[in-house]
Amino acid sequence: MKKTLKIIGILFLILMGLGSLTKAIVKPVAADSLEEQIRRANRDCPIPVANGVGQVSSISLEDGFIVYKLDYKPEYINIDVYRNNPEATRDMFYLAFLCVNGQGGHSDMMSNELIKRGLGLRIVASNGVSSFTSELSPTYIKEMQNRINVNPTKALHDALKLKFETENCTFPIKIDEGMILKGLGLEDNNIIVEVGIDENLYDVASFAAVSDEFADNIITEANNGDPELGALLDLCKISHTGLTYRLIGNYSKNHYDMNISSSLIRQNRNVPPQVNIH
């Protein structure tokens, strides 16, 4: 099942990029200009994730926008999904910005700085074959700041919901013999991975016997360098969520949940240093 989860995606990388710049702005060196703060953040680039599957390639100031350039290997991101859902994608980026902006007691410091200077955010994502651009104008940032008032964890959970709603159009996908990835979602404090099971090949109830071993194996494979699982567990850690594989029988519709608790993930994964979320 592990090999199917290509959800490294936009959200995690933009959290890392935003986190890098937020640190530079809220902890500036004396007499630093904003331009110098951006240059300092850019010196951390490229910021890789998941063994180089994706990266924040650069952070720069161009034409009144702070520009984040994100690059992925082609098979790890479906550019069309985001290009075809521009408003949801922009809102997801804003919620990620709100999450990072609210960390460490910094409140609205970064958004206020952007509004004061009349600057927006621009995200340019590429998979080496095609690309798309999403812009958060100063007007949009100010409107959203006036309309949305949530804590960082709630902002990130809302961003996750938007992410999954946007990307679920790519499912179902066959992931193994007798297994189909049906979709991703957020339920309570767990990321849910729905997997359809062919009951001619598997007894859904039999998975209960290997539940603990399954959780340990997922953690071990992630820590041994599996890019997809590593990114997925890191996303769970920074969003304070657990991970649930929901196995659903294709005939009976009975299901069994294979759970990896948030506490287990947090004990075994480190928060990426660019993301100031604990």
Model-assigned labels for residue ranges:
Residues 7-23:
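Hydrophobic membrane-insertion alpha-helices, especially the h-region
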Residues 60-110, 182-235:
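Mature extracytoplasmic domains of secretory-pathway proteins
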Residues 1-4:
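Positively charged n-region of N-terminal signal peptides that target proteins for export
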Residues 48-60, 99-128, 173-185, 224-251:
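Short glycine-rich, low-complexity/disordered patches
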Residues 117-154, 240-278:
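C-terminal partner/receptor-binding element of secreted or periplasmic proteins
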Residues 24-65, 73-77, 147-187, 200:
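N-proximal, solvent-exposed amphipathic alpha-helical segments enriched in charged/polar residues
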